[in-house]
Amino acid sequence: MQQIMLMCRPGFETEAGQELMDSAAACGLFGYFQPIRNAGLVRFTLGGPESAFELMQRIPLDELVFVRDWFLVIGDCPLPARDRVGAVIEFLRGADWQGSLASRLETRLTETNEDRDLGNFARKWVAPLSRGLREADMLAQDSASAKGDRLELLLLDFETAVVGLSLADNRSPFPQGIPRLRLPASAPSRSALKLEEAWKVFIPEDRYLDYLGGGRKAVDLGAAPGGWTWQLVQQGMMVTAVDNGPMNPELMATGHVEHVRADGYAWRPKRAVDWMVCDIVDKPRKTARLALDWVGGKLCRYTVFNLKLPMKKRYEEWLICRDILLQGLAEAELNCRLRARHLYHDREEITCFIERLD
């Protein structure tokens, strides 16, 4: 297998392809990418003797920012109007597919798919296709024998399926990298979902209490009307909301929030807190330096902040901000972990997470 299918936010295909091309080159692997414009899909093809599997063994998905999820591409399978199950079986036989490689399959759609009939077909097709593949020894009979690797079928339309394999230890825990979240009626704004998604992406599920529990203290810079503050309060935190704008009255009535009318970039706490979060729309380098000031000054242990990218050279701007952050953390001689991801609930921004490990 020489090709990988990348999934990203529609409109950011070039950034995702460039990012993987640079990451591969850093490992001594070279290839090229073909974006499927405004579909949130990119085909990345290795140009040398190395396999796509080798590339995925060297590059953890967690280290990528614009790539939400990916899988190894076996090939494009034409789907006839009749007996599509048989067509997939014959395609896999022709590709020398080993049934022990995967124990289950998933059907995928492009994020921009608006064909309800295709969506209904994708859901209903899983059971008969799985049954047919197992009967043909194209799927392992039990999950233990396949180590959790999964056969993927990305339906571009009713005529074509991109068939591939996702690796259990290097794929998103969420379908196509998108957590399915619902906005409670009590949340002041939809931005609440962004912070929730950030926690799900950056924090191991079995360590939620370690990071978020125990009555922690937090600061929300640029808080109004209170979407991120609301999420912090839901975790039982005492929150200082810093913003010159008005906060949601119901949120203030919880007794967990102190509203400070001040400039989020200038204000600093008298004592260190556990969390600092910031969703201020401003120049990304300014926000990156703000986060460095908080972490470097040991004003917080954890921070989640957004970097608003420009309309042009978005990937290049992220690289500049990344270097600012990494260099600043190194100069502060702090043991920290930096992660970033273009979340589903992000638009023209990316979300960063820094935690102090000392």
Swiss-Prot record:
<dbReference type="GO" id="GO:0006364">
    <property type="term" value="P:rRNA processing"/>
</dbReference>
<comment type="function">
    <text>Catalyzes the 2'-O-methylation at nucleotide C2498 in 23S rRNA.</text>
</comment>
<dbReference type="Pfam" id="PF18125">
    <property type="entry name" value="RlmM_FDX"/>
</dbReference>
<feature type="binding site">
    <location>
        <position position="263"/>
    </location>
    <ligand>
        <name>S-adenosyl-L-methionine</name>
    </ligand>
</feature>
<comment type="subunit">
    <text>Monomer.</text>
</comment>
<dbReference type="GO" id="GO:0032259">
    <property type="term" value="P:methylation"/>
</dbReference>
<feature type="binding site">
    <location>
        <position position="191"/>
    </location>
    <ligand>
        <name>S-adenosyl-L-methionine</name>
    </ligand>
</feature>
<feature type="active site" description="Proton acceptor">
    <location>
        <position position="308"/>
    </location>
</feature>
<keyword id="KW-0808">Transferase</keyword>
<keyword id="KW-0949">S-adenosyl-L-methionine</keyword>
<feature type="binding site">
    <location>
        <position position="243"/>
    </location>
    <ligand>
        <name>S-adenosyl-L-methionine</name>
    </ligand>
</feature>
<dbReference type="InterPro" id="IPR048646">
    <property type="entry name" value="RlmM_THUMP-like"/>
</dbReference>
<dbReference type="InterPro" id="IPR029063">
    <property type="entry name" value="SAM-dependent_MTases_sf"/>
</dbReference>
<dbReference type="InterPro" id="IPR002877">
    <property type="entry name" value="RNA_MeTrfase_FtsJ_dom"/>
</dbReference>
<feature type="binding site">
    <location>
        <begin position="224"/>
        <end position="227"/>
    </location>
    <ligand>
        <name>S-adenosyl-L-methionine</name>
    </ligand>
</feature>
<feature type="binding site">
    <location>
        <position position="279"/>
    </location>
    <ligand>
        <name>S-adenosyl-L-methionine</name>
    </ligand>
</feature>
<dbReference type="Pfam" id="PF21239">
    <property type="entry name" value="RLMM_N"/>
</dbReference>
<dbReference type="InterPro" id="IPR011224">
    <property type="entry name" value="rRNA_MeTrfase_M"/>
</dbReference>
<dbReference type="InterPro" id="IPR040739">
    <property type="entry name" value="RlmM_FDX"/>
</dbReference>
<keyword id="KW-0698">rRNA processing</keyword>
<keyword id="KW-0963">Cytoplasm</keyword>
<dbReference type="GO" id="GO:0005737">
    <property type="term" value="C:cytoplasm"/>
</dbReference>
<protein>
    <recommendedName>
        <fullName>Ribosomal RNA large subunit methyltransferase M</fullName>
        <ecNumber>2.1.1.186</ecNumber>
    </recommendedName>
</protein>
<dbReference type="Pfam" id="PF01728">
    <property type="entry name" value="FtsJ"/>
</dbReference>
<comment type="similarity">
    <text>Belongs to the class I-like SAM-binding methyltransferase superfamily. RNA methyltransferase RlmE family. RlmM subfamily.</text>
</comment>
<keyword id="KW-0489">Methyltransferase</keyword>
<dbReference type="GO" id="GO:0008757">
    <property type="term" value="F:S-adenosylmethionine-dependent methyltransferase activity"/>
</dbReference>
